[in-house]
Amino acid sequence: DYPLYYDAVNEKGLAMAGLNFVGNAVYQEVEEGRENVAQFEFIPWILSKCATVKEARESLNKMNLVGTPFSEQLPSAQLHWIIADENEAITVECMKDGMHIYDNPVGVLTNNPPFEQQMFQLNNYIGLSPKQPENRFSDKLNFNAYSRGMGALGLPGDLSSTSRFVRVAFTKMNSFSGVSEKASISQFFHILGSVDQQRGCCEVADGKFEITLYTSCCNTNKGIYYYTTYENHQISAVDMFGENLNEKELIKYPLIKGEQIYWQN
């Protein structure tokens, strides 16, 4: 079995995920004398070599990302990537004009458009705040902040990737977490819940809908991978450090999809 990763983390605490970049991703041609890495090998290539974002940057400058397909049935996926450790994050995009590596100060990424465009559009929301707004419309008019949360009026609520980028960036940058690991885990899933996709709201074909298949995070110090699925809101966990990290065979766990309900009587 050869795994094709959506997201992954290594034992050093470096994590990486790929997201859709259809129409913008252009991979390079194979070049003699360079370390050519196929798109489907990119995540394991980085995570098997690097322990930090700094090391990933150095490796990226030496490699050539190519579009060799995994198989005839699975052509190269058009993706861009976020790479992060506990201190920083970067976004990697391979486009017609070459590879781009960006600092990612918000630590989030969604699908299209290119990252520079996503970051620039945050300027449109400079006035958003978690605090209640003050009247800046006119000192000649008396306004009433009739509801809590009005400081975030204008925060986009649709399911487009640009709007989800703004929404999850605002939520992440303004959220507070408790000090315990459980509190942090809970808060993480609440943050990503702000961009959850519900079946029926985003139709991609006749009768077919885009949904949030799963949501995941990892304690990179302990090697514990936490996840929920669309059908199961209960957080499941896999202790990856509890496995033999030198194992040559692929260790697999099935996604827990059935809803787990805690009965109180």
Residue ranges and their predicted role:
Residues 62-100:
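Catalytic cofactor-binding cores of redox enzymes
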